[in-house]
Amino acid sequence: MNISLPSEPDEDCLKKPVGISDQFKIPDNQMTASSQHDTGCCKPAYGRLNGDRGDGWCAKEKRNRKDDWLQVDLGTTIEVCAIATQGDINGNEWVTDFKLSYSSDAQNWTPYNDANGEEMVRVTPRYFDASLESY
């Protein structure tokens, strides 16, 4: 299985969202994480774009943890042409960088490397009202 994230995603691909924002396409039990914040408002399944449940997914320790992960089982091999992240709808918290890996068996993971051969995918920090905008 191969994955590629072109610098300019194909328009046809962009018209076919994977469905992570839809809990009926990707059920809650197909979203898992390394940990979650104790309050119960930050479950892995709350890490969906445009979600209205909880505060999004939050790792147990919110600050400076580089080893936490959110995993989504897409159920099949698909083309991924873009990735979007969104901040907490109730506060000023959002992802600043992340690593992307893929697997066909949830055991053996291959890191996605960007055009520079770097494993880390950087998200340009944006300051915005997280309850109104998503990028």
What are these regions (language model features)?
Residues 1-6, 42, 64-69, 90-135:
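Trp- and acidic/polar-enriched beta-sheet ligand-binding modules for extracellular glycan
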Residues 2-75, 115-118, 123:
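Disordered, acidic Ser/Thr/Pro-rich linker "stalks" and the adjacent N-terminal cap
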Residues 15, 31, 78, 94-98, ...:
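Aromatic-residue detector
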Residues 27-29, 75, 79-81, 96, ...:
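A short, local hydrophobic-aromatic micro-motif
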Residues 31-33, 78-91:
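A short beta-strand element within beta-rich, extracytoplasmic domains
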Residues 71-73, 81-86, 101:
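Residues within well-ordered beta-strands of beta-sheet-rich folds
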